[in-house]
Amino acid sequence: MELNTKKKLHALSLAEKIQVLELLDESKMSQSEVARRFQVSQPQISRICKNKEKLLADWCSGTANHERKRKRESKYSGIDEALLCWYHIARAKAWDVTGPMLLHKAKELADIMGQDFVPSIGWLVRWKRRNNVGFGTRQVLVPLFPPEAPPAVLPSQAQPPLSLKDFSPEDVFGCAEVPLLYRAVPGRVFECDRLQVLLCANSRGTEKRRVFVGGLQAAPRCFFGVSSEALPTSYHPDLAIPWSEWLAQFDQDMGQQGRQVALLLASGVVEEWASLPGLHHVRLLPLSASSTTPSLPGSVILAFKAHYRHRLLSKLAAMQSGKEGTSLAEARASITVLDALHMVAAAWAKVPRQLILSSFVQEGLAPGKTPLSLDKDTEMSPVPSGLSQEEFSHFVDLEDEDPGPRVCKEETGTEDSGREEDGFEPLPTKADALQALCTLRRWLECNSASPELFEKFYDCEVEVEQLCCL
């Protein structure tokens, strides 16, 4: 008779856990009865119920390994997700993806993100298991007789194309690429200061996607010490927006939320990306071929650019008044790409929900009967002092002007001028952050700041002090 016998642990795969959830939802069986059926303990069934939402999100993502019993989170989740996006793009282009290619690409992505990471064979094996990835050429047996052609579908039996009426307003999204000269000032335009901004929001204005920005610089000096997750927007080192990568991330996010959404795009773009594999939760809806309306209403784009220009002029004015003798050109040259990303995020957050909702309805891009009436003051950012309404409106659309190539050559590298000899500036310490709080509070005290402003400062002070304690 064996005395020291250990009960063998029986772990359930993801597919079996989904069966457990379905059984509990569809029948009147108790957790104990389900546990006996699957030959596991009742606490294990209880944990499955507790993690129901996460398990369903993994199941719906389309990338999870359904037969895997345990899921370990990757230490380098950012690299993990970026490599998965690249892998889907490569497979969509019918590339023969190999292990060495993935290892090389993972190291390249880690360098771009500023992470000290060296991928190994073991890491690659675990990455493939986590994301249910397999690659390599497969031999396909050619049948002796060609398969019969499927019967033709009569027009009456064909499924009608999806339209806006098939989605709720919260699940209808529009997007637009917006060129932005992030350091432009009235009367001076520099082509080398160009960014490409991708904005996306739903027709209710209740959900704005994280801004995606493409830039000319692969690794700006101002990004030193800042992880990609800490950037206020997503950044891509190229003015050409990687649509397949962005769509794959959008689809993954919607899958985790268990949603089916529509993305409005120009008819030509929809035809180009219709064959993109892996889009399970985002349906591309084409605008009419004769339509000149962008999928994100023009008034929304104009409001975003107006808020950005207003914030830029305020920042330049503060720089000039803060240090005597600072010219407008010097203040403009000190604006970095990182400064621009922060101002882009702030400007996008400033676009009111009511404006987005009204604009979608007015242009017929969302289900609705009558557009909402908005005050003109809420549609545009207030005109900065020193400019007329006409001058500010022209300043907002400076991207339409044609800058000379000579100016672009003169402005190359102005952002990093004066720093090349000393290298990168040292990163601020916790002591520097606390001292900066003291300096800011003292300045507010000496300039008779309002109680409302002090309340905002106190909130910031508490957050910074808590970060310093970590």
Curated annotation (Swiss-Prot):
PROSITE patterns: HTH_CENPB, HTH_PSQ
InterPro entries (UniProt xref): CenT-Element_Derived, DDE_SF_endonuclease_dom, Homeodomain-like_sf, HTH_CenpB_DNA-bd_dom, HTH_Psq
Subcellular location: Nucleus
Region (Disordered): 402-426
DNA-binding residue intervals: 31-51, 100-130
Keyword Protease: no
Tagged with keyword Metal-binding: no
Positions of the DDE-1 domain: 167-360
Domain (HTH psq-type) ranges: 3-55
Domain HTH CENPB-type: 67-137
Keywords, sorted A to Z: DNA-binding, Nucleus
GO cellular component, as recorded: nucleus
Amino acid composition bias (Basic and acidic residues), ranges on this chain: 402-421
GO molecular function: DNA binding
Family, per entry: Belongs to the tigger transposable element derived protein family.
Protein name, as recorded: Tigger transposable element-derived protein 3
